[in-house]
Regions:
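Bacterial Sec-dependent N-terminal signal peptides
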Residues: 1-34, 575-576
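Long, low-hydrophobicity, solvent-exposed regions enriched in small/turn-prone and acidic residues
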Residues: 55-70, 77
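Short alpha-helical segments and helix-capping/turn motifs at coil-helix boundaries
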Residues: 60-64, 98-103, 141-145, 180, ...
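Outer membrane beta-barrel
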Residues: 68-70, 74-165, 194-196, 294-315
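Hydrophobic, small-residue-rich alpha-helical packing segments that form membrane-like cores
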Residues: 139-238, 242-247, 252
């Protein structure tokens, strides 16, 4: 017998696919209908050794359908999502439900753009506002409301937003919080073309964002009294700010091959659960400088964030739920399997760090460069928590709650190293064009306690090799080998993956991640994976079978936990 959950999942997926076919065959007058469909499902098999727990419904899946109608300057769209029986990692973060949770209507001309419904938006680098979607992470914090964009003169851009932030599949009705804001940017190269013609870049911008959340309860906390012991402290509801504003100013300047970006943001007092309900204002600074010329490039970045976690609701602390802003991660992002679980997660309440990357190409037709040159990339990044000195009232009470919390020297690094990465990558294409080899080395230091809640530090050496061979113009073979040596956490691992592709339609791969150095002999496990994919026009169908170890998934410094799993997966994506 097929379970009710499987029947519903199959029915929903079939209806969504049918909708794709139906809409893909029609055009209404001068308008055009387009969209895309995605399904990601899995049949789960329990495995006690890797920690893959039995689940009530073994067949699970995530499905969505986007429909967009456009006609001249007008467009309207909606997205239906079916996550009633989602993949277990989505269920664990509360991303479960179904319905049309994204819909909008938009009109745009050269002067104005107006949107009603759901929309995504970002001001500057996102220090004050970033409403975005990342389906892989289960993040969708779109705003439901209205947005206006104005371009009164070329190079002058003004935006204003008002809306309620999406909270997974929870209803909007009854919410007592909303977000509003405005942003202005002036691009002097567009306003005065002579600036751009001379090779200069000059842009400045500023914004303000404010959240409102009704304060309806007192906040209780413990105070340590020398004579009375532990007593209860109270923050009256009328002392809890209902309106919390942030503002930011940014600038970009450049000349030919040099560019400098800077943005500073400040948040008013925002007592909430993630900062232990302190009244200290927050602030963040982002700096980036780049220089590039033929065969050489250098990029340096700096970030400092102090008490800058900014959410629609003060009691929310789950993953990235109801986050209004996003502090960008400036460290280099990697796709290596073995250090994926040690990716750095940006810390909006306490981080200071820097990143340096140098790219150099050994000249073509030289002894070391060969016919096509050899690319070398060096990378170094280091992040600490910030310096914190408790204010006298916090010391006296034995808690920062209800006080200004702490003071902090702006450019002083805190005592705790969060993350450090030293990396070197060499890429070379051989003279016959058929062979390409990438060799990489990284030394990672990762604070398990602060970043993942596990005890200790992880210090590890990673060596990775990626060798590609073009068998024929359409057939290619790729071998990826990795070795992570560490005495910390789960110990050393090796990874091997062989991929064969027949362009442009077929892809096959087999891989194995062996945690041979695990201190527990039972968990010296092989995490194997076999997959194949077929691509036809805009449609991709993929099958995979294997094991996934428990860890984290990170995209751009935003992370979520990934539970261990074992089973057969199916993925379908298409657009029309």
């Amino acid at each position: 017998m097929i379970s009710t959950s499987i029947k519903r999942l199959l029915l929903a997926s079939t209806l969504l696919l049918g909708s794709v076919w139906a809409f893909g065959q029609h055009q209404i007058g001068n308008g055009r209908i387009s969209g895309d469909f995605g399904f990601n499902g899995m049949y789960y098999i329990p495995d006690s050794i890797i920690g893959a727990e039995p689940v009530d419904s073994k067949v699970r899946g995530n499905a969505f359908l986007n429909i967009l109608y456009s006609n001249g300057g007008f467009s309207a769209g909606a997205r239906y999502e079916f996550y009633m029986f989602p993949l277990i990692d989505f269920e664990k973060i509360g991303y479960q439900g179904q319905g049309i949770k994204y819909f909008f209507a938009d009109y745009t001309n050269k002067f104005i753009s107006v949107t009603a419904g759901n929309y995504y938006e970002q001001f500057g680098n996102g220090l004050t506002l970033r409403a975005y979607e990342d389906r892989q992470l289960g993040i969708d914090n779109s705003l439901l409301g209205a947005r206006i964009k104005l371009t009164p003169y070329k190079g002058i851009h003004i935006k204003a937003v008002w809306g309620i932030e999406r909270d997974n599949f929870n209803p909007y009705l009854g919410r007592e919080d909303y977000v509003r804001g405005a942003d202005a940017e002036f691009s002097f190269g567009e306003i005065f073309p002579v600036i751009q013609e001379k090779g200069f870049i000059a842009r400045v911008g500023a914004n303000i964002v404010s959240k409102f959340e009704k304060s309806s309860t007192d906040i209780l906390f413990d105070i340590q009294d020398d004579s009375l012991g532990t007593v209860t402290g109270v923050i009256p509801q009328d002392k809890v700010p209902q309106n919390v504003a942030t503002w930011a100013a940014r600038a970009t300047f450049g000349y030919k091959d040099f560019r400098l970006d800077a943005e500073y943001a400040r948040k008013m007092n925002d007592p909430n659960i993630t900062n232990s309900f302190i009244y200290k204002p927050g602030e963040a600074l982002f700096l980036s400088a780049t220089y590039a010329m033929k065969g050489f490039g250098i990029a340096a970045s700096f970030i400092r964030a102090d008490n800058m976690e900014y959410r629609s609701q003060r009691w929310m602390n789950q993953n990235s739920e109801l986050m209004i802003n996003c502090i960008p991660a400036i460290n280099r992002q990697y796709s290596y399997q073995l250090i994926g679980d040690y990716s750095y997660a940006s810390q909006p309440n306490s981080q200071i760090g820097a990143q340096l990357q140098i790219n150099y190409q050994i000249p073509k037709k030289s002894v070391l460069g060969g016919k096509y040159g050899t690319d070398i990339t060096f990378n170094y990044s280091r992040f600490h928590d910030i310096d914190k000195q408790p204010v006298p009232e916090a010391v006296e009470n034995g808690t920062m709650t209800g006080t200004m919390g702490y003071t902090s020297s702006f450019f002083k690094f805190g005592p705790n190293l969060l993350y450090q990465d030293v990396g070197l990558e060499i890429s070379h294409r051989f003279n016959n064009k058929k062979w390409k080899w990438i060799l990489a080395y990284n030394y990672i230091t990762y604070n398990l306690e602060i970043l993942q809640g596990h005890a200790g530090m992880m210090r590890g050496h990673l060596v990775a090799s990626d060798l590609s061979y073009k068998v024929t113009p359409k057939h290619a073979l790729r071998l990826e080998l990795q070795h992570l040596y560490t005495k910390d956490d789960c110990g050393s691992s090796v990874y091997a993956m062989l991929e064969y592709s027949i362009s442009p339609n077929w892809f096959f791969s087999v891989g194995d991640d062996w945690n041979y150095g695990n201190p527990d002999p039972i968990h010296k496990t092989h995490y194997y994976n076999i997959s194949c994919a077929y691509v036809w026009n805009t449609t991709r169908i993929a099958l995979n079978f294997g094991k996934t170890k428990e860890g984290i998934l990170c995209v751009g410094g935003v992370c979520r936990a990934v539970p261990a799993s074992y089973g057969l997966g199916l993925s379908v994506t298409t657009s029309f």
